[in-house]
């Protein structure tokens, strides 16, 4: 009986020992990778053309990281598909920390716009650190007979479906900003999509359409010349760059909040030690006075975070924008 018992147990013990050894080797291999990282060039993918906020943030980070880590760090612009093409390239890259993504709120909006999406935003990308935040500014033609948001809502309710707001295109952040205003303020302002912010702003300034939401730098430039009037910002608190402009939440739309964030991602499954190192390097890079000045010039504010904090922000926005997109029946399929 004892002999038979040994025959049954022995293979099981051997199998268990083998599994434990394999697990140990895998852990050792991963830890070793993290210890020698980085040992070669790091690539930061930007899913938009050069010159925009994500691109400039990536270049600031690349410059500072290169000096700190002693390895080359380059920016790789891969525009197209509203940011999906570049993000997908990082989602499908090796999980070694050498291919990163400087992403934005567009990453949380895009999955809700398509019935089939090339990657899983929760599993295939690892949030490393938020970098900066901003918001949109509600602009109206200066000839519109309103002095604040309360007046605008009153006017829109008296003319349901007759007024128009412009956007940079279907599914853009200013499109969703406007859709949220329609919902929360109980108004019906029609959407006119353009191919970019500039032509939409031109038509607001010319009085062809009544209003739109625009990024802070664009809003400031047009308002300074008197071409548009700024009524409110979409962020939960007033912006340091525009302290005199109230938030929508304090302007008769109490539940309104739409913040734009920018942040660094690694491929899903990247070792946590590498992710933590990258988060520390990101914080170090944007703690430099010169980098902070560049953020201000871009019309954004520093918003550095831990990987866990950034993951929560991204997941919350994935859920929120899915609800908004569903409520307005928007699809880009």
Model-inferred region functions:
Residues 2-20:
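Bacterial N-terminal signal peptides that target proteins for export
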Residues 29-31:
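N-terminal signal peptide c-region/cleavage motif recognized by signal peptidases
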Residues 33-123, 162-164, 170, 186-213, ...:
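N-terminal (or domain-start) structured segment
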Residues 39-41, 224, 272-333:
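An extracytoplasmic/periplasmic, membrane-proximal ligand-sensing/linker region
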Residues 92-97, 112-199, 248-250, 261-294:
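Hinge/capping helix and adjacent helix->loop/strand transition within the periplasmic-binding protein
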Residues 102-107, 167, 197, 214-219, ...:
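Beta->alpha turn/N-cap motifs
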Residues 107-116, 182-184, 211-245:
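A ligand-binding cleft/hinge motif common to bilobed small-molecule-binding domains
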